[in-house]
Each structure stands twice: as structure tokens, then as C-alpha cells.
A protein has these predicted regions:
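Conserved acidic, small-residue-rich alpha-beta core segments centered on
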Residues: 187-322, 329
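Structural motif
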Residues: 6, 139, 166, 230-233
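Sec-dependent bacterial lipoprotein signal peptides
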Residues: 1-12
Length: 343
């Protein structure tokens, strides 16, 4: 499972004064070796005709003892980018590098200005949740609730969620917009999702790296989503809006919600990010983060490359020009249709 916050919970191998070493070759070898023994997606990420050892041979000729720190950083970054993993990140005092093509190479399917038009000027903010009802039937005053959650790095508590859902008690359903939510704390994903689970639900499995071999993993451990014990349990229809910008803990939230019967994922396949980040420190003090576990859905499928929506919908330019959000409009239709059969 994914969370930037959990990075602080894993064991970091830190450089001591005795270990401190500015040698480009020493740092190149340290980064390559750390990933070699700890990274979890070699089989999924590298082409069939390539190996991690071949990557070492490919980039070693670019290492020289007279190179600058900037040049070394660029070579190490290029080596890491071969893994095409958004969680693989290198941090120095002068730069940070992470792979971002999981999002950048795809349509965004979101227009922020149009999204806030639906929230209107009277929206409220419950800590990290921006919310407002949307009236879609002017004569009958029917409405659905819209929740926008920008980042799971922003804390959300049960009291906040209860306040939002209480305000939507007369709505036919709820839309949760997590488009471009790049993740954050996994605990926030569990907290929010727990208010929509009527019973304990298997939402996936996690396998942890247990040894230096590329295939050494623990047996899959079940991940169970439990209903909240702290307030409102929402049973009406829910639509979660997704795009390629949904990553890491937000990807997990999409995975959790997809397993619930009253929930529909609508939009585009998420960006993925199914590995729990681990961290270490290079001899020169630069920090390295990478995926150290694998997350699977209840059927055993990897979620590293994203979670497909139940209903694929793309944002139309013609709708944007009219001030409309194609995904929100379709989500309203789904909720209206589902609410007809909801007690």
C-alpha cells in the first residue's frame, strides 16, 4: 500500500560520518545495489530483453571521478528512470527527480476552473474536504453531493466526514472527485473509505520484499476495509471520479472504493503506484525512495499500473467551452439511475 507518510515508518539506512563518501563510483554502486536488493517491480518494469545488471553496465561508463555533483545526479536519475516508477525518487540539496510519465503522457480529464463552478461560491471546507450540493433538477430541487479531495497528504478526520455526509442527507448520492490527487497518507484513505463500507470487505493483498533476490516476497497478506465505528455510514450511490493523476494512496482509495457495491468508478484509469515506499541514504547524503512491496486487487491483479474505471468517460472540449464537466455530468446520471433502486 502507498503513502508518503509511511516513508517515515520504514527503516532508513543512514550514512554515518565514517561512511560518508563523495566518490561518484561509490554512490553509483550504492544506488544500484540498494535498488537491486530492495526494489520490488523488476519483473513488471524492465523489458523482457533487459536486466538490472545490464542497466549497471549501460550507465557505468558515464561515471567518472572528476564529474560534478550535478552530473552525477543526472546519471543516477537516468538510471532510476529506467524503472518507470513514480515512487522511485532521488533527493539532493539542489534537486529532486522522480518519474512522472505515468501522468504526463495522458490527458488530464479535469479542468479546475470548471470543477469549482459546480462547487459554487457557497462551498464549505471540512478540514481537507471541499464540498457542496449540486442541484440538477431545478423544479424538484433534486441534488447530489460533491466532495473534492485534492491530496491524501491533507488530514481528514471522522468528524469532518460526518459533517459532510450529514449535510448531504437529502441528496440522492455523492460524487467524490479525486482527480489529480497524487496520494499521501494511507490512513486518510482508510478513514474516508470506511464511511462507505457496510461490512468488512476484502479490498486487496500486499506482498513485502523479504530478501535480496528479485523474486523474494512474503505470501500475500489480506487488506480488509472495515466499516467506520465513528459516525455516519453512507449507503446511497457513490461515484468516484478518477484520472491518470490519481496515484499512490489515492490509487489505493480507488481500489478500496471499487470493491463496494454502491460505488462506481468513473473517468480514466488511475496512474497507479502500488508499491509501499521504502527509503535509504547514499554515501554522499542524498536520499533515495523506491517501491518495496506489491499491492494486488482481490483477484490478485497488480495495481501498479492503475485501476480501470467501471465507466470510462473523457472530458470533452465542447463541454468545457459550455462550462460543463463531462465526468460530473455523467456521474449525476449514474447516481440518479442507481437511486431509483436504492431503498
Amino acid at each position: 500500500m502507498l503513502s508518503l507518510v509511511l516513508l517515515g515508518l520504514v527503516c532508513l539506512s543512514c550514512s554515518t560520518e565514517k561512511d560518508y563518501n563523495l566518490s561518484p563510483r561509490a554512490n553509483f554502486d550504492a544506488l544500484w545495489h540498494e535498488l537491486d536488493v530492495g526494489y520490488c517491480y523488476f519483473q513488471e518494469k524492465l523489458p523482457a530483453d533487459s536486466t538490472w545488471e545490464m542497466m549497471h553496465q549501460k550507465y557505468l561508463p558515464r561515471i567518472s571521478e572528476g564529474m560534478s555533483s550535478y552530473e552525477l545526479f543526472d546519471v543516477l536519475s537516468a538510471l532510476m528512470m529506467e524503472l518507470k516508477d513514480g515512487h522511485v525518487t532521488l533527493y539532493s540539496s539542489f534537486d529532486t527527480k522522480a518519474y512522472d510519465e505515468w501522468r504526463a503522457s495522458y490527458p488530464s480529464n479535469v479542468d479546475r476552473q470548471v470543477r469549482f463552478r459546480y462547487l459554487g461560491s457557497a462551498y464549505r471546507i471540512a478540514r481537507s474536504l471541499v464540498y457542496a450540493p449540486i442541484e440538477y433538477n431545478e423544479h424538484q430541487k433534486d441534488s447530489v453531493g460533491l466532495i473534492y479531495y485534492s491530496s491524501f497528504s491533507n488530514v481528514v478526520g471522522h468528524n469532518n466526514i460526518n459533517a459532510v455526509l450529514q449535510s448531504f442527507q437529502n441528496c440522492r448520492g455523492v460524487i467524490i472527485d479525486i482527480r489529480d490527487n497524487g496520494g499521501g497518507s494511507l490512513s486518510n484513505a482508510f478513514t474516508l473509505a470506511s464511511h462507505f463500507a457496510e461490512k468488512e470487505t476484502l479490498v486487496g493483498y500486499t506482498s513485502y520484499k523479504t530478501g535480496p533476490g528479485h523474486c523474494e516476497f512474503s505470501s500475500p497478506k489480506s487488506t480488509i476495509l472495515k466499516p467506520t465505528k465513528y459516525g455516519i455510514l453512507w449507503k446511497k450511490p457513490v461515484v468516484v471520479l478518477t484520472n491518470r493523476g490519481v496515484y499512490s494512496a489515492a490509487n489505493d482509495f480507488a481500489l478500496f472504493m471499487k470493491q463496494l457495491p454502491q460505488v462506481t468508478l468513473l473517468g480514466d484509469t488511475t496512474g497507479g503506484g502500488g508499491g509501499l515506499p521504502r527509503g535509504s541514504e547514499l554515501p554522499n547524503g542524498w536520499r533515495l525512495r523506491y517501491s518495496g512491496s506489491k499491492t494486488m486487487d482481490p483477484e490478485g491483479n497488480q495495481v501498479e499500473f492503475g485501476i480501470p474505471p467501471d465507466i470510462k468517460v473523457s472530458l470533452k472540449e465542447s463541454d468545457i467551452e459550455k462550462g460543463k464537466d463531462t465526468l460530473i455530468e455523467e456521474a449525476i446520471k449514474v447516481i440518479v439511475e442507481k437511486s431509483k433502486s436504492t431503498p
